[in-house]
Amino acid sequence: DYNNNYSFVPEFGRDLMSILDVPKGSRVLDLGCGNGSLTQALTDVGYEAVGMDVSDDFLKSARARYPHLHFVEGNAVNFETDEPYDAIFSNAMLNWINDEDHPQMLKSVYDALRPGGEFVFECGGFGNNALIHRALSNAFASHHMKYQVPYYFPTIGNYATMLEKTGFRVIYAALLDRPTPLLGESGMRDWISMFIIKPFMGVAPDVKEKIINEAVSDLRSVLYSNKTWTADYVRLRMKAIRLYD
């Protein structure tokens, strides 16, 4: 259950809110709002927040949990707004977008901000879950298959360059190590099942089971201690301003 087992995802987003500098009452878009918990948190601190997500399931969950808030369906890569936002906020979403789609997504964000508006985000950064992906790569290789990391984890340098090419002024960037405890004895197996989908497409169920067992066994010596699994998260946190035209 994503809402219960991975509640650390929105929890980290609450800390990210601290680098928003727009005044209370500002219009803020929560881009990739998921279950809406951060849209509510943005509202709680005084922003006029709107949540946007491409997932019907997430939007249904968000509307059920927070019926008083405004949620819209939209794709981060291509979205438009009638009225520009003072800030666009995004937590743990950008690395789900294919790397080739990021320039277009940044253009959509830029166009949806007023001049001087802020884009504040955090996502998986360079080195994110590197130990987990290495273990999966080794396990796939032992079954004569190639593993490809199904997410885009940029460096500060390549993402700052992309933002600047779009017309943003980058004013803050950090790569943060964030080792994160996972729930229960099956925490690592559950994490792989929840977040690693694409590489297993077309893989027979029994082979998938063997690959996961091998990866988990491989990771036990580095990411399991005191009866707790830890995911080796690295987060890219950035803040950029849309320049005045």
Spell out what each predicted region is.
Residues 29-79:
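Class I SAM-dependent methyltransferase SAM/SAH-binding core
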Residues 171-227:
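C-terminal helical/coil "lid" or tail adjacent to the Rossmann-like core of SAM-dependent
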Residues 1-26, 37-41, 120-142:
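Conserved class I S-adenosyl-L-methionine
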Residues 152-166:
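Short alpha-helix
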Residues 103-118:
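A short glycine-rich, Lys/Arg-flanked "PGG" loop and its adjoining helix->strand segment in the class I
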Residues 87-101:
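A short SAM/SAH-binding and catalytic strip from SAM-dependent methyltransferases
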